[in-house]
A protein has these predicted regions:
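Substrate-binding cleft and catalytic face of glycoside hydrolase catalytic domains
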Residues: 69-166
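N-terminal structural segment of carbohydrate-active enzymes
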Residues: 2-98, 102, 108-111
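Intrinsically disordered/low-complexity terminal segments and short unstructured peptides
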Residues: 1-2, 121
């Protein structure tokens, strides 16, 4: 079967992008106030992750985000879906925000926008703060309040610069 796509055009508002998650690319797992997530703890269990890899360094996007944005721009994407590490912005899962974590994400979102790339933010990608897991995790009825507080704080901090949320 032959398909001729020479006349095909994407719609003007089509979003062409890539996606990552904080735990898979950020690294810096114990820097600037970030506390462990359930994924960090799981990854330290022998035999659970190939070659014993952990999210501690990952792709080191935390330290290389400028270069990452340059590569995204070079590829030609106009959208980038990434997640916020809940334990980077709220080290205890609830309560006081970590200003270093908030500042990191604010800089990321601003760099993406300056490069013409729309940030599309995922609030949760399998990385519940370990502090909340120790309080019962998702099966604790309070988890509804925990997530609501987290979501509210993220929208309050970034809602004016982040156009898309998942």
């Amino acid at each position: 079967m032959t398909t001729n796509n020479s006349n095909f055009k994407y719609p003007k508002d089509f979003l062409w992008g890539l996606a990552t998650s904080a735990g898979q690319v950020e690294g810096a797992a114990a820097e600037d106030g970030r506390t462990p997530s359930i994924w960090d703890v799981f990854a330290t269990k022998p035999g659970k992750i190939f070659n014993g890899e952990t999210p501690a360094v990952a792709c080191d996007s935390y330290h290389r985000f400028d270069r990452d944005v340059e590569m995204l721009k070079y590829i030609g994407v106009n959208s980038y879906r990434m997640s916020i590490s809940w334990s980077r912005v709220l080290p205890q899962g609830t309560g006081k925000l970590n200003p270093l974590g908030v500042d990191y994400y604010k800089r990321c979102f601003e760099k993406l926008l300056k490069a013409g790339i729309l940030p599309n933010i995922t609030l949760y990608h399998w990385d519940l703060p370990q502090a909340l897991e120790e309080r019962g995790g998702w099966v604790n009825r309070d988890s509804i309040e925990w997530f609501g507080e987290y979501a509210y704080k993220m929208f309050r901090e970034f809602g004016n610069i982040v156009p898309m949320w998942t």
